[in-house]
Amino acid sequence: MLKMSVTPMMEQYLKIKEKYKDAILFFRLGDFYEMFYEDAEIAAKELEIALTGRDAGTEERAPMAGVPYHAADFYIDKLVKKGYKVAICEQLEDPSKAKGLVKRDVVRIYTPGTIINPESMDEKSNNYLVSVYREKDNYGICAVDVTTGELYATEIKNCKNGKRIYDEIAKYSPSEIISNEEFLKNNKYIKVFKNNNCAVNAYKPLNYEASSELIEKQFDKKVEELELEDKKFVIHSLGALLSYLKELQKTSLKHINKLTLYQDNSYMGLDSNAIRNLEILESNRNKSKKGSLLGVLDRTVTPMGGRLLKKWLEEPLIDKDEIEKRLDAVEELFNNYRERIELKELLNKVYDLERLASKIVYQSVTPKDFISIKLSLQNLPKIKNILSKFSSRLLKEIYEKLDVLQDVYELIDKSIKDDPSNQLKEGNIIKDGYNEMVDKLRKASTEGKNWIANLEADEREKTGIKNLRIGYNKVFGYYIEVTKSNIPQVPDRYIRKQTLANAERYVTPELKEIEETILGAEEKLIELEYELFNEIREKVELQIVRIQNTAKYIAIIDVLISFAEVAETNKYVKPIVDYEDRIVIKEGRHPVVETISDEGFVANDIDIGPENPIMIITGPNMAGKSTYMRQVALIVLMAQVGCFVPASYARIGIVDKIFTRVGASDDIFAGQSTFMVEMSEVANILHSATSKSLIILDEVGRGTSTYDGMSIAQAVIEYIHEKIKAKTLFATHYHELTKLEGKLRGVRNFNVSVEEREDDIIFLHKIVPGGSDRSYGIQVSKLAGLPYSIIERAKEILEALERDKAVKNELEEAVSQFAFTQIDIFSSAKDALIEEIANCDPDNMTPLQALTYLYKLKEKAASLRSGVI
């Protein structure tokens, strides 16, 4: 920056700015945060505020832009959301008491993953900062929400599948990612995160020893106690995360006190494709909660409950006992309507305890925040009392562990006014009776104001000036104001202080004496209230872990009540869950479609198990194949989340992962062909699925030529059948694949029934056994509104193609048999030829018959070799 002579204040600014070159520096000057030079120019443009100048002791004025300190959060959030880092430089001493230049320094730095203002974010969404450490094909991944204190960590070793790492990070929808350089090199997924408004920055990790020391200090436990002794890559990732936060937050991180360590198989596996294709968190159409599974299930009334519900949907359980604990709790709440309603009404009065707790640690909590905490805690004894009536394991456990925080409630209740000022330096915070000195100073201040009122009345009477008034401002203090028309009546004892356009302001010795008494008391009172408030904050801060635990249990109750309420409203049933390799659903419905459909939803069954793990589903477009497959996946997911399901009966064999290849993809593979994207996704499924997985495949192979696509589709089915043995729903337009039912033991055909009426069709949306041999493409096109002339021309072309059915059938048979020759075990033509040779009886043939038979066999063998039967 500038090297020439500058003013002392500007010199101070430049020294601080030198340390934070990559941040926009908010420099506190009185009641404003000022920005200078390039920062000012950026701020003026991005915040749409005036760009002015300030004398800096140089020839040219320094460009300057500023925002009021009391509105700073709004402007900080705006800059951070645009990707800027913002450093807050505060005055570290009272300017009125400073000797010389006021001391200033940076007290906090904000980035997208470290903003702490709850008003700037969706209350039912987390704001995650993710730290990634990579060493060859080994990864340590940590995610933290600094506004709630939640911290998660996992380690993935020997992973060459970049998509798997992407999915693990993407499930947090991070606002910011920090990582070592090795992770950033040649990583095509980094662009995807950046395109989704996620800041991605390199951060040099600490060495192993320094990371371990930082972790142990943060959690006050040894690495072994945290079960990290064999988690080298997590230690590097977590060490970097904590180091980064301490650099930025410059305060204690007491609210980050629990590390949740998990493996990537701790929950049902849901990759980003499954979450998107099943529209679990948001609708693909409008990118909002409405139209998603979350939108249907979310009846939560607390911010904590809303956030927990999202997490549960992203991480369905795979432990039968844990699932049943949730289901039993939902059932008990479902059956006890009155208690459920009472609980919900009480929960509705609970504020965001998690984020309020974080504000206490960050010293950004306000007096009104404490009242929000008090009002929340006030309801806890009533909540606990209702919980005492329940007997299900989970609700009983919550009842036993729920801390009503009576001591915290009593402290706030006796110390903080019921309607306090929200500004710490304005007083009116501490309740009467809490502190003797506060009471004395407040009385002096109040009596002083009474003296002012009495003095005003006396002066009006003595002078005869009826509109005389006594006022106050911060510059001149107390004054007597007289309008110009009444100046002749002003007595000599009045001392002129200020001239206005229509009035004069005066003081008197008596007024100055009262002023000193009042202002002295008020100043001392404000300082004392501020000190006491900080003492109260520190006392409550010691109970942060207890507050967080209570918030966690409140969130669980909220989600369980939400599940019970939705189950009642939408007529869901309690599913049976077990470890059997079977899924049975009777009269299943799509949980989202049934709520938005104007027509009655057609329910469908499924019974899929070891003897029939693969369903090939045929039928026309728009008939409901995709809806059916998605509803099966969603019902399984809901059951494993611990929610009742839309069906008349459901028995769910727990699945370890759900995979989907449905419809268009997102921009992960931007620049690649549709077919390449499809094949990449299918390959990922085939590499990752197990016999306990549920696979949903829709129109695999459609992105290439008919024969290529059909061959690929069949090969995929064969591979799943022989190698993976996963439960699979496979929708296709390749009717030739229905012949696999007779070739592969575990394949069964189903189709979506339609009713034909002359040239029209009616979709019955019913899944029935058997394959379909027609696509009804022309009829569907007619329903879709294609012009009449095109429909008629399409009919003519179709009739021409169907005229020589013998040729058509021969071609189809040839293609089909060609496909079956690819794997010996499925070569029915070859098997038939071998069977024919084995069964022939040459002893009973004449020489001519034997020769004729031999030529016939030779012709069949030649046809087999050429691939045409």
UniProtKB/Swiss-Prot annotation:
Record GO terms (molecular function): ATP binding; ATP-dependent DNA damage sensor activity; damaged DNA binding; mismatched DNA binding
Matching InterPro entries: DNA_mismatch_repair_MutS, DNA_mismatch_repair_MutS-lik_N, DNA_mismatch_repair_MutS/MSH, DNA_mismatch_repair_MutS_C, DNA_mismatch_repair_MutS_clamp, DNA_mismatch_repair_MutS_core, DNA_mismatch_repair_MutS_N, DNA_mismatch_repair_MutS_sf
UniProt cross-references to SMART domains, sorted A to Z: MUTSac, MUTSd
Gene3D superfamilies in the cross-refs: 1.10.1420.10, 6.10.140.430, DNA repair protein MutS, domain I, MutS, connector domain, P-loop containing nucleotide triphosphate hydrolases
Pfam families: MutS_I, MutS_II, MutS_III, MutS_IV, MutS_V
Listed GO CC annotations: cytosol
One of the GO biological process terms: mismatch repair
Superkingdom in the source lineage: Bacteria
Entry keywords, A to Z: ATP-binding, DNA damage, DNA repair, DNA-binding, Nucleotide-binding
Binding site residues for ATP: G619, P620, N621, M622, A623, G624, K625, S626
Listed PROSITE patterns: DNA_MISMATCH_REPAIR_2
Cited PANTHER family: DNA MISMATCH REPAIR PROTEIN MSH1, MITOCHONDRIAL, DNA MISMATCH REPAIR PROTEIN MUTS FAMILY MEMBER
Entry function: This protein is involved in the repair of mismatches in DNA. It is possible that it carries out the mismatch recognition step. This protein has a weak ATPase activity.
Family from the record: Belongs to the DNA mismatch repair MutS family.
Protein name (record): DNA mismatch repair protein MutS
Annotated source species: Caldanaerobacter subterraneus subsp. tengcongensis (strain DSM 15242 / JCM 11007 / NBRC 100824 / MB4)
